[in-house]
């Protein structure tokens, strides 16, 4: 059996007689090789019943891509044997059954706007839905699935910035929301907190996902600009408190911190930046699982960091520095205003996604992870992945999500 993965070579000497263990290969190559071997040596009907079948979908897809890319006439390593078309077909069948189902639901006006951003960005491997009490606004949303909630409570006219009305509206359409979320393994609930519909419905939607459907539930929300007033901020903080109690992790992006990134933007443009940050956060988390890359993570990796992660914050960095673009991008992420006044040494976990052009090496991505590891609690759980986007040649982007850290 021979497998090619990212210029690494695995040949028979790497396997023992049972074909179950792999020595002398990278962690990623090890995982893929084990996966392919399992599907050869273990009855498929038995393997499909195991929990691992859910966790390793992205790695199956890697194996498919690898087996396709290898020319059947090539011989790399003495005694290597080509992956047959029969194995390709079996892998395809298993991959189809093992897809991790990821659903993103935008609540209220802000959450629905973020869904539009997700549609434009073409997030790979996620289903999108927008819910709102405002019928006119919902008409402007390009989501594949839209739910007008609270027809009786609001008659399609909005929640009037009253969270209790937003919650009642969601309860009115509970069955439809539940039906949309059914089958999800990961649910992102996104909203701009402070108004009526998003603030009132987000925690209700999250409770369905978490408690009824046992999905890994991640809130991704913004807090209002100071200029939006005291009442809106009070509503937002009350809504955040309810949301964090039902989500595994709640990623919070304070809008005022965005102004430190783009201080000269008018407030309407700043709202669009907030939508963009929300979208990029969910895109990064989704595609680190679903999109083939140099180093992918699977469902269990994400669950390790996000399960009971509490309040979390995001940092974003980018650099094309010729001297040391990795260090520059990571330091920008670590010092991002979006992380706020948190103590990284208290962090329970961190997830790092590194994206670069075709010139990026695994060594660079690994160094990014090492810099973050040295900056946080030594007992924090750190996971990282990296992928290639050819248009980023010369540039490296870093998405950092820190869980469990407390404000200073």
Predicted regions and their residues:
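Periodic, rod-like helical contexts
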Residues: 13, 24-31
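Short, basic, low-complexity termini and linkers enriched in Ser/Thr/Gly/Pro
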Residues: 1-3, 8-10, 23, 53, ...
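N-terminal polybasic/positive-inside topogenic patches
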Residues: 17, 30-37
